Amino acid sequence: MKTKIFKNISILLSFGLIVKVLGLFHRIIITRVLTLDGLSLYTKMMPIATLFSVIASFSLGPTITQMVAKNITKRPYSNRDLMIKGFKIATITASIVSIIHLITNYFITHYLLQTDELFKPFIYFIPLYYLQSYTGIFKGYFHGHNKMNTYAIGQLIEQVIRIILIYIFITPMLKINLEDGIIACVISLSIGELIQNIFLFLCVLKTTKINNKTNIKADNKAIITTSINLTTSRLSNAICNFLEPIVFTFSFLKTGMDKVVADEIYGIIYGYVLPLIFITGFITTAIETAILPELVTHHKNNNHAAFKNIMNKALLLSFIPASITTIIFYSYSKEMLMLFYNTENGAFYLKLLAIPSFLSYFDGVFISALIAINEEKKLAKINLLTNFLYLFLIFILVQIPKINVMGLIISLIIYLTTSPIIYFFICKKRINYHLPKEGYILLLIYIISICSIAFFKNIIITIIIYFLLLLWLVINKTHSHHSLSS
């Protein structure tokens, strides 16, 4: 079992690294091609498009993962029927969302975003709602069967297509005007998604037997109920992302500042800073994706020890990218921005957000654990609470003249640190989960490393201290195992 989990994590990490590098390369080119003006407009659309996409996809991906994972052991219904009904539900929800999008397009771009240039580009997101919904179903199916490499290859193909399209499609369109260039960016997302869907569909037909012996039809009610619970949680985040630029711009303009400045600041934070902070997020995503089917199985079999053991190892693995990434970006904020985006815009914000983002790297493990024990409703409530708090803080703090833009940064810091702490205490209460002593030692190592940066002002000394402490932890743990064995 352990071998399977780490094999899946290794597969996802290997492909995830390649996909992330390609995705980063794609983002760097797009950022430089669009310039700050184009990037500000492009990032302004994304939260609303994401909101519509979340509703359209209806969380069918994780729902299918759960149901297929359970179906492997008990086979309560046909996998073939499960897939067919999933696609039908996805088509219906995507169609409803598309109609709503068309009806509200002018209102959103003119009144909410106050940017008429986005009227045409925003319409081109509609095909993406269908395609992302179908991709989610394929992803859920392959992950439920622990076929992690198939979906990973699909992602790899998608990124390659997007990069090719920059040169043969986006760049020529940008020469016409900025609006057509942004439209080309949106269309390229749909083309990449379409190619990935075709690949995954062929893999289902060729390598996967979805016609199992079970003739019991999948229950629409079971699919919809699970999807509603998961969607409620994701919807809360999507609505928050949707309202965030609106609330920020409104509060910022109340102080008498210019709208162009508001768009630029938002573009810097969400176009440069946050993508960099979570640049190694593919590692934690790979971990949480790989452990979910196993956690579901262990919970169903009442194997609590194995359940907690997987959580411990997943948190330990998440610590590595969390600590290294945040320390590097805290120490070299200007250098990192110059390296990736050829600009120092946002260096101050990157330095402020780097360390507080550390805890958010553990979100995924706790969320996977709570989903596995059927606590989707509680997850939705927590997300709703933290998102409301986040928007409320932006609304209040940004309007205070002495705080202004820093109100968004303060709100982000509180938001990034609150959720993982709440998730931890729920896991502690619900499954009697306790962080192992190694976890506390690692936290201490991280704190000492941060303090040493502040004291010595030298990252080299910090790295030496960091790895010496880690070495001490490994030696100490090995010695403890030998002592127990003897």
Residue ranges and their predicted role:
Residues 35, 146-150, 160-198, 377, ...:
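Membrane-interface helix-loop junctions in multi-pass transport and translocation proteins
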Residues 4-65, 98, 102, 128-129, ...:
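Signature of the first transmembrane helix
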Residues 131-154, 355-385:
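Membrane-interface junctions at transmembrane-helix termini in multi-pass inner-membrane proteins
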Residues 91-235, 239:
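Hydrophobic transmembrane helix module of multi-pass membrane transport proteins
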Residues 1-22, 77, 81-84, 217-237, ...:
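N-terminal membrane topogenesis motif
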Residues 58-73, 277-302, 308-311, 315:
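Helix-loop junctions and terminal segments of transmembrane helices
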Residues 84-111, 308-359, 391-392:
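Alpha-helical transmembrane segments of multi-pass membrane transport and lipid-handling proteins
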Residues 169-175, 187-215, 245, 413-457, ...:
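C-terminal transmembrane helix end/exit motif
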